[in-house]
Every structure is written in structure tokens, then in C-alpha cells.
Amino acid sequence: MALVVLLAVFTVATMQAAADYGIVINGYSVWEKNCNDLSGIKGVTGSVKYDPATKTLTLENATITGIGKERCLFNSECEGLRIVLKGSNRIVNNEEVGMEFRSATTICGPGTLDIRTNKKEAILFIYVPLTIEDCEITINSENTGIVGGFISEKSVLTVRNSRVDVNAKNGCVVYFGGIVLEDCAIVQPKGVVFDKGCMSLAIDGEIVKGRLLIGKPNYAISVAGVAVTKDNCNDLSVIDGVSGIVKYDGITRTLTLENATIAPGKSTVGIFNADCNDLTINVIG
């Protein structure tokens, strides 16, 4: 009888372990019994659900408010987790970390995410890569923003075609292994680089605190009242009032006009160089 009971307990424990997907929300594990609707978890509103087949956690117009000393969202061992944002989403935690990742995670759009923390990090990723793509994330933290947790080359942050606006008193993007920017750039402040000395985004060796903005690069030039960006720089003739060949090379800082006409509307400047040092305007024809 004792052996039967022991085997029964072991079987139940094994089943529970197999059903646990390695994701925790406000201290509650995500598993097969609740994954289709996680809005029943205390502190969660809106639509939150998990698909174990694709390892996709979807937040749709959702708010996760931290409860006590619990992290709002914790990926402990779901390797390759994708967090899909739909609509406007919020994570608020006054006591603990907003989001913590100990397995490789991707946060992706098309929606937005607003993270607010008071005492701890907004996003913490430890010894693993973190990817942010095709979305908008706004962070406001009385402590730190995006943090690698431990200084490790494995903690690489990739930001792809996204806007990440970090406001953090004690450091915006700090203590991580490196950064990869694709179809976006550090827009503000100027002069920010990844500093291997402090393993953080810094200016002249000083960690950036306050505000740091990653977004679509703006070349500080406008043509017929329209900002020149990475999206439109190869063909500026699509701008109203512009004809012929007008294009901009962000690497050489060269604006080329070839048999072009720029006829902006009333009170609009044809070409305005707001802050592009060493701009060259190449006129052909």
C-alpha cells in the first residue's frame, strides 16, 4: 500500500512538472490548466494567454500590476519565449522587477508596452539574450531601466525596428554584454555608445541616466517640410512638392539633387538642415 501511495504521489508530481511551462505571472505558474486565459490571476486585467505549441505569450490591452514581492512576469526556463503585444499594455510594479528573463526571450509587436517600476529594474535579463522587435516600449523607473543583471557576454540586447523610450534615474540600459541595433538607432542623447568598461550604454564612460531613446533614425534634415529618415531617404521625390531625383545617403551625409525641383507649400522651407554637421548637397543637372 505504501508503495502504491508513493507511486501515485510521484506520478502526480511528474504530471504537474510536465504541465509547468516555466513562466510565472505575479507568483502564479502558467500551465496547461490556466494558459488559455490568464486574466484570472490576481493583478491581471485584459487578455493574457499562452500557446505552448508556439511558446507565445500574448498580451492584448492587458495590465499586470505587481502583487507584493512578486515579479509581474518571470520567464524562468521557457527557452525561445515570444511575448506578443497587441494594443496598449502596461506592467506596473512598485516593489519588484517588472519583467525578468532567465531564458532567451523576444518581445514583439505590433502593439505597445508601458513599464513602470519603483524600487527595482523594469526589465532584467540574466545570462541570456533579449530581443525587442517591431514594437514600442516605454519605461519609467525610479531605479534602473533595462538591465543585464550580471555582466556577461551572453546578455546581448537586440533592438529591431522598434522604439524604446527609457526614463530611469539610476541607469537606462546597463550591465549587459552588448547591443545590436537593426533598422533603428540611439536617437537621444547624442554621443551614446556601448562602453565595454562599464558594460552599459554610456557617454564618455559615464552611464546614461535620465532619458535614453532608441528609435527610427532622423537625419536632422527636412525636405519640403518632411523629415528625412531611414525609411524615405532613398527616394524623397514622393514628398509633395518634390520631383526629379532627390535622395540622401546617411553614411556620407550627402543630399543629391538630380534634375530636381523642390516647390514646398507656403511658409515651408525647401531644404532645412537642423543639425546635420558636414552635410554635402550634390547638385546634378
Please give the residue ranges for each predicted region:
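A composition-driven surface/loop motif
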Residues: 16-285
